[in-house]
């Protein structure tokens, strides 16, 4: 269901409502931080994702788990929003709602999401270099990096900004050389 048009259709109004609440209370960044933490948790815990999306599990149990996970650090408006998702039986779309909220937040703050794949983990200097390059290409004020590692790249990076892909990997360079030699 992840990424389907139906889930987007369901998630979008909830994300917009959450954005509206966060803007009217000047909490957009705070909600963004909490939502990023929640997404990390969902991505690292398939059990939690399955628990929340399981229709057999009672709403009270889902609320209790969410209360424990979110704790007192999370703003009450966001906690109440999560309880609303449970009540409306939309908690299965939590991941999509969170992703959509972050997309709206990036749009609001003129931030682009750059997905970076590298052969090894990027150090701070390399991360900053990628951020600077993405800012130049996109004209955005800020860049949110989503980094992953793929040792098959041998070296270099692949940067994806929206639908644009920049392949500066050694594997990509070797492939381009191979194609050009094959055409000779």
From Swiss-Prot:
Signal peptide: none annotated. The keyword Membrane applies. NCBIfam families: ATP_synt_delta (TIGR01145). F-type ATPases have 2 components, F(1) - the catalytic core - and F(0) - the membrane proton channel. F(1) has five subunits: alpha(3), beta(3), gamma(1), delta(1), epsilon(1). CF(0) has four main subunits: a(1), b(1), b'(1) and c(10-14). The alpha and beta chains form an alternating ring which encloses part of the gamma chain. F(1) is attached to F(0) by a central stalk formed by the gamma and epsilon chains, while a peripheral stalk is formed by the delta, b and b' chains. SUPFAM superfamilies: N-terminal domain of the delta subunit of the F1F0-ATP synthase. PANTHER family: ATP SYNTHASE DELTA CHAIN (PTHR11910). The lineage of its organism: Bacteria, Bacillati, Cyanobacteriota, Cyanophyceae, Oscillatoriophycideae. Keywords: ATP synthesis, CF(1), Hydrogen ion transport, Ion transport, Membrane, Thylakoid, Transport. It is a peripheral membrane protein. Transmembrane segments: none annotated. GO terms for molecular function: proton-transporting ATP synthase activity, rotational mechanism. InterPro entries: ATP_synth_OSCP/delta_N_sf, ATPase_OSCP/d_CS, ATPase_OSCP/dsu. The keyword Mitochondrion does not apply. Belongs to the ATPase delta chain family. Gene3D superfamilies: N-terminal domain of the delta subunit of the F1F0-ATP synthase (1.10.520.20). The gene is atpH. This is ATP synthase subunit delta. It holds the Pfam family OSCP. GO terms for cellular component: plasma membrane-derived thylakoid membrane; proton-transporting ATP synthase complex. F(1)F(0) ATP synthase produces ATP from ADP in the presence of a proton or sodium gradient. F-type ATPases consist of two structural domains, F(1) containing the extramembraneous catalytic core and F(0) containing the membrane proton channel, linked together by a central stalk and a peripheral stalk. During catalysis, ATP synthesis in the catalytic domain of F(1) is coupled via a rotary mechanism of the central stalk subunits to proton translocation. It is found in: Cellular thylakoid membrane.
């Amino acid at each position: 269901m992840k990424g389907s048009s139906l889930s987007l259709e369901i998630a979008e109004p909830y994300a917009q409502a959450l954005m509206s609440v966060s803007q009217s209370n000047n909490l957009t960044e705070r909600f963004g931080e909490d939502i990023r933490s929640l997404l990390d948790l969902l991505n690292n815990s398939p059990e939690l994702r399955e628990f929340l999306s399981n229709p057999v599990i009672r709403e009270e149990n889902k609320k209790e788990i969410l209360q424990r996970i979110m704790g007192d650090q999370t703003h009450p408006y966001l906690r109440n929003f999560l309880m609303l998702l449970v009540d409306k039986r939309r908690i299965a779309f939590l991941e999509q709602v969170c992703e959509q909220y972050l997309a709206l937040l990036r749009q609001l703050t003129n931030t682009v999401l750059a997905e970076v794949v590298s052969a090894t983990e990027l150090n701070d200097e390399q991360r900053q270099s990628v951020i600077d390059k993405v800012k130049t290409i996109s004209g955005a004020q800020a860049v949110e990096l989503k980094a992953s590692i793929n040792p098959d790249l041998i070296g270099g990076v692949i940067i994806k900004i929206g639908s644009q892909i920049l392949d500066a990997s050694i594997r990509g360079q070797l492939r381009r050389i191979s194609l050009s030699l094959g055409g000779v």
